[in-house]
From Swiss-Prot:
Protein name: Vicilin
Pfam families noted in UniProt: Cupin_1
InterPro entries in alphabetical order: Cupin_1, RmlC-like_jellyroll, RmlC_Cupin_sf, Seed_Storage-Functional
Job description of the protein: Seed storage protein.
Gene Ontology CC: aleurone grain; vacuole
A GO MF label: nutrient reservoir activity
Region Disordered, residue ranges: 235-257
Signal peptide extent: 1-27
SUPFAM superfamilies xrefs: RmlC-like cupins (SSF51182)
Species this protein is from: Vicia faba (Broad bean)
SMART domains: Cupin_1
Family classification: Belongs to the 7S seed storage protein family.
UniProt feature, compositional bias: Low complexity: 238-252
């Protein structure tokens, strides 16, 4: 078979060029029908009382079939008031816990020991499935806000929690055992066990209520309760702070913001911890990142080669644009390409889809692998992301002075792939002097705004 020439490769190169130049897309979708955006009201309240709440985001694959690869991942949001404690429990799921705001004491129980950690904003730790722990808001004024990525080990997407201490609405895990087993296990009469460890008749009352009634009664459940300052001081005595070392331990928390950012300039900062840099993340194959985009700035268009990134808006507002395929049915795409093969570029371009969304605190975004994305901040924007399939992931930027993959294309290929000449493409790419983050306003618009301001100043100066 004869070797393929550059001219023979023209349709493929054209496709690559169109994928790079996301601005050519002919259609867009707003927040309402955007399969990659979950507004904050998509969180379901599992528990709420005067001391705080626990909320779980709806299943990713229930929101869209495009997210079926995330069926075993859930997002959990926890919030509590000052001087409160989230009582001991264990869950059949691995957790990656990130402190969004506030100060906490996390105690993790081991068979023959316990570890307590003093946590602050940006601190992150993995809690293996089955770990029993309790979380205290040790601050005097600020609410504690925690985000958890949850990976169940029994039923995909269905984490189950078991309380160590019970109440009338949710009994202790111990109450599920028979009297004989409990008496033999503790070598104590059942009445004493019931008095000391179990909620009296809690199991019977619990099963008499339906799910709806239990949710209504959730206001009375003692899952998040008050704790005294003296008790907090006792718990905080031997608490360790997060690791500031370049390499983290297998069990201690690490702070996302204490390391050097991988990208940084006056427009924003991008912090990231990968499995290579942290052993806690290796078996889960997940990276965690923390992004700060300053008001009026832009995280430049880029995509991840392998990772699917789940992003939560912690603070601020902005705009999100994601480029994908208009028709996600690949069989349908092939049929259209066969029918319109001679039209080439024009027919392919119609498949490029722009997904847009306005971002507010609590919103969640999903960025599939290979889908270019850009995020603009209308106010100081803070994002927390979990990257699934982190191993061997590569981030490719499509604009900017550094790490711009388009600039690596050979000049003869640029001549074939883009409407402009190779020189024109290079000149265009060189217009952007920033890397990774940049001013969100185009240069011409910025210049025009400055001219208007100067004109207004000259008019006002005449008075």
């Amino acid at each position: 078979m004869a070797a393929t020439t550059l001219k023979d490769s023209f349709p493929l190169l054209t496709l690559l060029g169109i994928a790079f130049l996301a601005s050519v897309c002919l259609s867009s979708r707003s927040d309402q029908d955007n399969p990659f955006v979950f507004e904050s009201n998509r969180f379901q309240t599992l528990f709420e009382n005067e001391n705080g709440h626990i909320r779980l985001l709806q299943k990713f694959d229930q929101h869209s079939k495009l997210l079926e690869n995330l069926q075993n991942y859930r997002l959990l949001e926890y919030k509590s008031k000052p001087h409160t404690i989230f009582l001991p429990q264990q869950t059949d799921a691995d957790f990656i816990l990130v402190v969004l705001s506030g100060k906490a004491i996390l105690t993790v129980l081991l068979p023959n020991d316990r570890n307590s950690f003093s946590l602050e904003r940006g601190d992150t730790i993995k809690l293996p499935a089955g770990t029993i722990g309790y979380l205290v808001n040790r601050d005097d004024e600020e609410d504690l806000r925690v985000l958890d990525l949850v990976i169940p080990v029994n039923r995909p997407g269905e984490p189950q929690s078991f309380l160590l201490s019970g109440n009338q609405n949710q009994p202790s895990i111990l109450s599920g055992f028979s009297k004989n087993i409990l008496e033999a296990s503790f070598n104590t009469d059942y009445k004493e066990i019931e008095k000391v460890l179990l909620e009296e008749h809690g199991k019977e009352k619990y099963h008499r209520r339906g799910l709806k009634d239990r949710r209504q009664r959730g206001q009375e459940e003692n899952v998040i309760v008050k704790i005294s300052r003296k008790q907090i001081e006792e718990l905080n005595k031997n608490a360790k702070s997060s690791s500031k070392k370049s390499t983290s331990s297998e069990s201690e928390p690490f702070n996302l913001r204490s390391r050097e950012p991988i990208y940084s300039n006056k427009f924003g900062k991008f912090f990231e911890i990968t499995p290579k840099r942290n052993p806690q993340l290796q078996d889960l194959n997940i990276f965690v990142n923390y992004v700060e985009i300053n008001e009026g700035s832009l995280l430049l268009p880029h995509y991840n080669s392998r990772a699917i990134v789940i992003v939560t808006v912690n603070e601020g507002k902005g705009d999100f644009e994601l480029v994908g395929q208009r028709n996600e049915n690949q069989q349908g795409l092939r049929e259209e390409y066969d029918e319109e093969k001679e039209q080439g570029e024009e027919e392919i371009r119609k498949q490029v889809q722009n997904y847009k969304a306005k971002l507010s605190p609590g919103d969640v975004l999903v960025i599939p692998a290979g889908y270019p994305v850009a995020i603009k901040a209308s106010s100081n924007l803070n994002l927390v992301g979990f990257g699934i399939n982190a191993e061997n992931n590569q981030r490719y930027f499509l604009a900017g002075e550094e790490d711009n993959v388009i600039s690596q294309i050979h000049k003869p290929v640029k001549e074939l792939a883009f409407p402009g000449s190779a020189q024109e493409v290079d000149t265009l790419l060189e217009n952007q002097k920033q890397s990774h983050f940049a001013n969100a306003q185009p240069r011409e618009r910025e210049r025009g705004s400055q001219e208007i301001k100067d004109h207004l100043y000259s008019i006002l100066g005449s008075f």
